[in-house]
Amino acid sequence: MQRWYAPRLNNIYYPYGCYLRVKINNMGLSLDDMEPIFKVIQALYNRAVTKKNDLDDILYDNKENNKNEEILIRKVLESTKAGIISYTKVQKDILMMNFPNNKPSPYMYCNCEGIDCEKNKPILTYVRKPGMIVSYENYGPWVDGINSTNKEEFIIAIFVLNSNNRLSGIDGNDSLEEYVRKSELADHTSWQDFSFRANNPRIISKIQN
C-alpha cells in the first residue's frame, strides 16, 4: 500500500479531494508508521504541489538538497508546463539504514535493481491526479541523464503531472491527465507514447528528455 499510494496516504496536502486513510487487520496506518523512503516520496510530492520547501516533514532538515524543476514542453500543450519534478539527495541516516534501525535499501522497497557495488543509481517515480505511483525507475529513459551517487547517499525524485493542462493542435478538448491515463493501457505500470486522434504528440518522451 505504501509503495503505490505514498503521495496520498494521510496527506493533508493532497490537492485533488480526500486523502487516503488505511486500515490493515483493523489497525490504522499513520504517517508515523510509514517507511522512511515512502515518507520521502510523499514529502517530494508535497513540495511539487505546494511549491514550498519548509514543510515540517522528513526532508525539513535537508532543505539545501531539495529541488523543484518545471518540465516545459512546447507546441503540444495549451500551457508549456507538463509537470514538476521534485527531487532530493538523501543520506542513509534519513532513510534509517544505519545502526540501530538498519532499514533495507530503497531499491528493495521500490522493487528496483541495485546491483552496482560502487554507486547508487537514482530512483524516479511518476504520478498523476489519483496519487497512485505508476512505477519506480532506476534504469531507462527516465533516469539516464541523472548521475549516480556514492554508496552513502541516494537521489530520489518524483514527477507530478500537470493534470489540468490540455492538449493543443488536436481535435477535441482532451486534458493532459486523460492522455496520460490512456497511455498506461490496462496494466498501469508505465507511461508510453501512442497515437491519439491520428496524431502522436510524443509527450512522454518529451517529458523524459
Model-inferred region functions:
Residues 1-209:
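Bergerat-fold GHKL/Histidine-kinase-like ATPase
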